[in-house]
Structures are given as structure tokens and as C-alpha cells.
Amino acid sequence: MKSTSLFLCSLLLLLVTGAIGRKTKEKYSQSEEVVSESFASGPSSGSSDDELVRDKPYGPKVSGGSFGEEASEEISSRRSKHISRSSGGSNMEGESSYAKKKRSRFAQDVLN
């Protein structure tokens, strides 16, 4: 009796593991197809060269955006704060905020 129940439990475990493996393989192959199609088709015609569009078929949907967008905005703001601290107030192009203000004031004076 014990060996029969052990055999049935082993068989059940094997079937469940196989089913989970198949589902995972199907999901992986579908996501692989989506990635290969997006690389084959190239950037969408509606986007500019500077803009990257990423389709998000999966993931949480929240009104007013998704968690991923909020997290990326937070990361970019942290990154810009870190860059401004580490570069002594200058931006990526090497121009300080003081020089930018001075240039914009000069442009306003010229326009007036």
C-alpha cells in the first residue's frame, strides 16, 4: 500500500512538473517571437529617431500610467540629481547652470 501511494505521488509530481514546464516553454517561445518580430520590423514609423517605443503586453495596468513608468521617472530624476552633484553643477554637455542662465538672460535682452 505504501509503495503504491508513493508511486502515485511520484507520478502526480512528474505530471505537474511536466505541465508547468510546457507552460513555461510556451510562454518563453511566445515572448521570443514578439522580440524577434519587433527587431525585424524595426522602429515604428510614427516615432522619431530619439524616441524608443517599448510594447508592454504584460504587467500591471494602473490608471494614469504603470508602475514601470513611475519607477523609470524616479530613476531618471535620481540619476540627474547624482550627475549634477558629481559634476559640480554642470550638465552632461559640460555647461554649468550659471552659464545657461547667463545665456538665456542675454537672449532675452537681445529680444527686448
From Swiss-Prot:
Entry's localization field: Secreted, Extracellular space
GO cellular component terms listed in the entry, alphabetical order: extracellular space; protein-containing complex
Signal sequence, renumbered to the chain: 1-21
Induction: By testosterone.
Keyword Signal: yes
Region Disordered: start-end pairs: 26-112
Molecular function via GO: identical protein binding
Keyword Secreted in record: yes
UniProtKB keywords: Secreted, Signal
Domain of life: Eukaryota
Tissue specificity field: Testis.
Amino acid composition bias (Low complexity), ranges on this chain: 36-47, 85-97
PANTHER family for this protein: SEMINAL VESICLE SECRETORY PROTEIN 4 (PTHR17498:SF2), SEMINAL VESICLE SECRETORY PROTEIN 6-RELATED (PTHR17498)
Family: Belongs to the SVP2/SVP5/SVP6 family.
Protein name: Seminal vesicle secretory protein 4
Organism the protein comes from: Rattus norvegicus (Rat)
